[in-house]
Amino acid sequence: KLIEFTNLVNECCSVMEDSYVADWLNKPNPDLNMEVPIDIFREEGMERILRLLYFIEIGEADV
């Protein structure tokens, strides 16, 4: 799980400012039905979050 978390943080850093990643992971996100990304990671894994990061990267979702 630690390696997966590290990979998740690296993915986040590739699409947003490094200094914002911790806040982003711990705040309810409207693009995730107001769920908290880190909670989704713990309960489901990375897939939904990686999909959102992709949409952020291509400009289809906001950070």
Tell me what each language-model feature is:
Residues 1-63:
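Non-transmembrane "mature" sequence context
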